[in-house]
Amino acid sequence: TGSGDSHDTDDSCLDVRGHNNVVENIKADNCLFGLDFKQSNNNLIRGNEIRSKELDLGVRGDGLRLWYSNDNIVEKNKIIESRDMVAWYAHRNTFRDNLGRRSRYSIHFMFANDNVVERNQFYDNAVGIYFMYTEGGKVRHNIISHSTGATGMGIGFKEASGAIIEYNEIIYCGIGIGSDLSPFQPDSTIEMRGNRFAYNGIGILFNSETGGNNMVDNIFEGNLTQVTYGGRGDNN
């Protein structure tokens, strides 16, 4: 418990620089950064509870960070009142059965390809899951609820391609799914199937009309606007 306060030196409760470790059942409290993995592959990160320092949201550190770290399993962790869980330049990681509450981004992927996000519960965060400059990835069987406020969004895409979004519950969010210039790569798609969008301000918002978004067997109920294309709404 209790890390330093410097963002310049990435002060954290646990700093990992190695492969094939098991990090489990740690309670990291009052940390600027919680668990920080850099260039660390094939680790099991399980059953940890992470809380940030009592700071304003924007100046907290990240609860869990994977930086240039691949093929890790992140499961059954609780990340509460942190800033973000991030995977930057981090590929083929699995995030499973985690709980994220009252943070900014539950998971923020950037330049991170082919990650899997399944059976997580994300409540009361500004954004549930965000894909930025990514290729591939699967998001399935998650519950994302109450991502509200000016930027409230369940799942977001920015110049992302090749993702599969299936069998998720996205409810009570400002925007269920928000997509900007996605899919980005030529001839790529984003597949959305079997999801439930309920009681959101907007079910799905497309900020650009690139095409390549395939939607099959999704349920829309009780959203103020079901789907908006470039500012044009469709409630049918």
Where in the sequence are the language-model features?
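Eukaryotic tandem repeat interaction scaffolds
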Residues: 112-208
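Repeat-solenoid scaffold signature
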Residues: 199-233
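Extracellular beta-strand/beta-solenoid scaffold signature
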Residues: 5-15, 30-33, 57-68, 80-84, ...
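Surface-exposed loop/turn motifs in large extracellular/passenger domains
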Residues: 11-24, 41-46, 64-73, 91-94, ...
